[in-house]
Amino acid sequence: HDIVKLIPTGWQYPEDTCVQIILEGKEYKTDNFKETPWRQTAEILVNGEPKGILEVSYLQEKPAKDEGPFYLEERTLIDVLAKFLGEMIELKVAKKIE
């Protein structure tokens, strides 16, 4: 999915940012994705049920900010993106039912 390629542009260090979305057992990730200790996650809910995780990580250690190396605005952004992904799935499911 192209969305994983767009997400890093919203973070302070886009060139050092990688993303993984795990949604209903499927993984979508940036080409540079790897597990690191410098990460934020947000649960993806579909109709109130947990269906996946959005993870944004830095590839290298960064200076401490509000939440580890991340700003509060980045926490807000990851939460909004996870909510958006959940709502898109809900819409897709609703259209299939029609």
Where does each model-flagged region fall?
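A short beta-strand signature within small-molecule sensing/ligand-binding domains used
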Residues: 35-44
